[in-house]
Amino acid sequence: MESSPLLQLPAARVEALSLSGLSAIPPEYVRPADERAGLGDAFDLARTHANDHTAPRIPVVDISPFLDSSSQQQQRDECVEAVRAAAADWGVMHIAGHGIPAELMDRLRAAGTAFFALPVQDKEAYANDPAAGRLQGYGSRLATNTCGQREWEDYLFHLVHPDGLADHALWPAYPPDYIAATRDFGRRTRDLASTLLAILSMGLLGTDRGDALEKALTTTTTRTAADDDLLLQLKINYYPRCPQPELAVGVEAHTDVSALSFILHNGVPGLQVLHGARWVTARHEPGTIIVHVGDALEILSNGRYTSVLHRGLVNREAVRISWVVFCEPPPDSVLLHPLPELVTEGHPARFTPRTFKQHLDRKLFKKKQQHKAKAEEEDGGNGDHHRHEPPPQTN
């Protein structure tokens, strides 16, 4: 079949590809053979997982004892242990009792869904330009990844906290509630991050050290107004219907560079996490927020908490949308290293000190080198014409 002019555009959005009616995905979206064994339609895999009573389930943890002043110490202790175990064994959990109103989460989802329902040409008014250093805005993962292939997703990406640093001119003007709902969700997620970091700190060092992790993430080597708070970045992932989900991924397997990542979604399955040697499909747990442990927290915990390897699958039936808030330390002014109390003769430091930006740069460089080596291997040792710039972000 002759390609349409749309499919020949170098920067065609994945949504436009999906709406074009193509029956086979372009070759640049086909994953390598060694990745495809576990891929498939996300709905089919979710149904299979739901019917498999031996399949492990991502833990669901209620943290309401830390938001309820009338809770008992035993309840808080049990909560600390449940969060600690989930972060250590899984690196991911569903958080219930988080205190963010269901009405606000519904508003956030409605606003993001309305933005992506706009025609592609309208969304292009918010297009980013990673090549020019403008990462915030509407985009597609057009840069190649570890294997050199593209991912089946479009996205909207921007800073949400601190609010004073956010450029609201880059945020969608439509729908009208987008800015208000997103700002409110950002404020509340910042509070949730503090609560969860306190619980995770207690799981490492005891109930009198609940401030350890947040201090480590915000204690700076310089003192400017922008340097003493966590940064929260929002990425709305839009995974269009895919005619060949057994060949593609929405997001390839990766760990997040953040300290924590908070995830909402529209109820369509797609998230998988690696537990042991098995890919586990996340179930829909209404009212909860999914939380990932990221690289920064794994470093601070000296590996006691696990940065979870995960990926996003696609399907033929429905669009999947997810809202991910990445909670990160300031990029240049905080030195990440294992907490001193967790480094002993029997448990030496597993990570060398680095800033968040240095960690991100190392990770991008490693991915670029992996892609280059693979390209050269496939090209008989001369892979110069396969070189690509790394993606604007690894999450």
Curated annotation (Swiss-Prot):
Residues 230-329 form the Fe2OG dioxygenase domain. It catalyses: a (2R,3S,4S)-leucoanthocyanidin + 2-oxoglutarate + O2 = a 4-H-anthocyanidin with a 3-hydroxy group + succinate + CO2 + 2 H2O. Keywords: Dioxygenase, Flavonoid biosynthesis, Iron, Metal-binding, Oxidoreductase, Vitamin C. Fe cation binds at residues 254, 256, 310. Its EC number is 1.14.20.4. Transmembrane segments: none annotated. This is Leucoanthocyanidin dioxygenase. It comes from Zea mays. The lineage of its organism: Eukaryota, Viridiplantae, Streptophyta, Embryophyta, Tracheophyta.
